[in-house]
Amino acid sequence: MKQYRKGLVLVACVLSAILLGSLQRYLVNGIPSQQLAKRWSDDEAFAQVACYFEKDVALMSEQIAGIERSLITALEEAALPAETENGGRNWVDAYSSEGELAVTSNRTTAQVRAFGVGGDFFRFHPFTLLSGTYFDSTDENKDGVILDELVAWQLFGSSNVAGMEVEINGAIYPIRGVVRSDSGMFSEAVEEEAATVYVSYDILAEAYGGSYPIDSYELLIANPVDEFGMTALTNALSMDEKNYEMIEVSARFDFLHRLDVIKHFGVRSMNTKNIVYPYWENRAKGYEDVSALLLILELLFMCYPIAWALNQLRKLYKNRKELKQKLMEKLKNVWQKAYPLLKRTVKTYKLVNRKK
């Protein structure tokens, strides 16, 4: 009975650890902004890197082209082309800055949170489209405007408004699309569900006098060796590392990183830099904490199975001579039973060959 209970506890611990691991993977897969490297390629190694800047030393849009040239040079030095033979790309980037805009429709005006975005922002942040399309780095007009459903309902009383127009800072812009307002764990805490518009960076900059600092820069790049992407971006920025925080997004939920989060669990929340993170990064940090807590529970549940396995190994080692003797005896018995049969088989085979 005692052994039966031990077996049940052992199985329950292992199953609990497996379930917690599955829950962690389910939660992580629920934040698409952290999954571009996985979506981009199953066969080749890519690193997704995010960089967030202090307000007083933030990046300016004029610096983006220089950063991109440096990244292309880093790829070429590693014998990797910026574009592959089949038309694929070994890097994509995006940048954004947060502010506020007054957006006016033919019905009313709404003061909303605004992200001025550039590059392939919507590759990194594939919001669910309710109508219309995204805009990207190929948009030469730089007049892209995307509303979330909260803004669309405030301004028009509907989410099906792609193609209609809004006024921002005295200029008229077509609405490219409407996206669903994300909701989920930590949404309220990080103000994820605040009424938001995503506009071309130039529109936001124009509203703030023609120039506006960039809060975040995101990069997906081929990663032939560990930390290649991080190193390439660090060299491209040529800034004091005290003025920004760089995160390898594609590795933030790996086992070793989760252990590091546990190690610095209290300290990591103390932000000593003048950085205001966008809501998606605050949400990801919350998921990091949850993921680390799940790992702690996984390890606790695995303590008993590991202790049981070590105890079994200890017993085997302690009784190794006796076990060896028993094994030899069993092998001897098997041989004694098998030898006569083998001998008869060989004898029969020889007789058959003689008759031939």
Residue locations for each model-derived region?
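Hydrophobic secretory-pathway targeting helix
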Residues: 1-38
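A cross-kingdom feature of multi-pass membrane systems that activates on extracytoplasmic/periplasmic
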Residues: 233-294, 319-335, 339
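Mid-to-C-terminal secondary-structure elements
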Residues: 120-129, 149-223, 243-268, 272-279
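Short amphipathic beta-strand/extended segments in non-transmembrane regions
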Residues: 48, 52-55, 64-128, 248-249
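Membrane-interface junction motifs in transport/secretion proteins
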Residues: 26-65
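Beta-strand-rich non-transmembrane domains
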Residues: 108-111, 116, 133-146, 165-181
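Solvent-exposed, non-transmembrane alpha-helical starts
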Residues: 57-67, 108-112, 141-143, 183-197, ...
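Juxtamembrane interface at the cytosolic side of transmembrane helices
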Residues: 301-350
